[in-house]
């Protein structure tokens, strides 16, 4: 029988032997021996355990997982083997206030028991299933094998130096055609024959991506490839689960394939490289990763995408879901790929003028604030200049010195809030909050939009950012990346006024007012409500 340890955060009343159905014996440990500590920090941990004497170590909750592995998300890894012997699991105590996690617990428990009893065969990732190709002849032979294979589809992925085609280039492509092995091919191995073979492959086979919008953009921009038929495992999963944040290839591979966190060795290498060279995480360049380090991770991307497609494509047996996928999500993906490539046209000169005008307005607003006698008096009493960006000073000025009545809204630490909503209400009592709010609003427009847009414009004065089909539970589009185009200021036209239509074109603003009610009236077959929309009437006044 395997020797097992179980580690929880601190002493609790949870009977873990009962929770695991008495399926195995274990030694129980706590990170912190003091049950009175509310939030256990690293300095509170006094655990004394020799991990080498155990075959398996069950880590209960996120604290234990992070302590031993530096991984934060226990839900993502629950029931999966991490490194050589760690088995993370969510804390069963959470089921009392989060009953929807019951399935996660049950599945994780069954998986852990099988690991400990030796009923799960260890999966080894080596060159037999994930390999690299740097030789041109070997590259072309592998692509020819994919063409000759009798399967209808292939899985395709790319490794790039940037998030946008104009900001980076392709380091290599990953390809899987049989669901048994994946290859990572360096673009340095490409020749004219390679490109001809790939063009033919993409024309004859269904190409399966995970996040097609990203990969297609690079393939189309840098190689002019086309994809007449493509699928997207990310969007297929979105049909199953609309909740944002859970559609990544890593997360789904951990959950639905036996290969788990296959990318961890590469990220461990990256962490070590950054540490040795004193490089910040945001400054690390993907091109610095050696081919021999990259190849396994990249090849596994294609293999796992293939496996996910085999599992998720069954969803399309549901005709309603298949219709949404085939008629909305896939065409929408194609449309948004083109939209992102087209970009948003800005007038660079007007942006620069607006930037200076806004700075002038900010300077004037600050000058007006400092001319207020309340500010000069406050500075004399405190013996230092007033900083409007300091929430501590602002709180003292508004509530202690001027004596305004707090709104009752508090911060997470229990202090009186000074956010925009609070300042708006306090403006009824004094001019100072109004002046502060004016400075904040103008500074946000300049810092968040004008200053950010200008350096990110491409040479054609267009901003190319992201639009997403899978970012909301409501089915609405979301925007992310270089700039969230859905959050341009409404109350100040200075930013939107810098968007410039191309010659011969116009910018059109359209808003589907009460679209959800419109759809509901049709689905409910409510004739009276439908008549309101047919006649162009006002829904709200009619209901009132």
Task: Kindly give the residue locations of the regions a language model identified.
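A polyanion-binding, active-site-adjacent surface
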Residues: 1-122
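Short active-site oxyanion
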Residues: 3-4, 53-56, 202-207, 383-385, ...
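Conserved RNase H-like, two-metal-ion catalytic cores of nucleic-acid enzymes
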Residues: 4-6, 13, 18-27, 122-255, ...
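Alpha-helix capping/helix-boundary segments
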Residues: 63-65, 214-215, 393
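Short glycine-rich phosphate-binding loop at a beta-alpha junction
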Residues: 56-60, 206-213, 387, 511
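Conserved "right-hand" nucleotidyltransferase catalytic core of DNA-directed polymerases
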Residues: 118-186, 244, 255-257, 269-494, ...
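Metal-dependent phosphoesterase core characteristic of DEDDh/y 3'-5' exonuclease domains
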Residues: 69-98, 105, 109, 176-178, ...
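Conserved catalytic alpha/beta cores of large enzymes that bind or transform nucleotide phosphates
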Residues: 498-520, 533-544
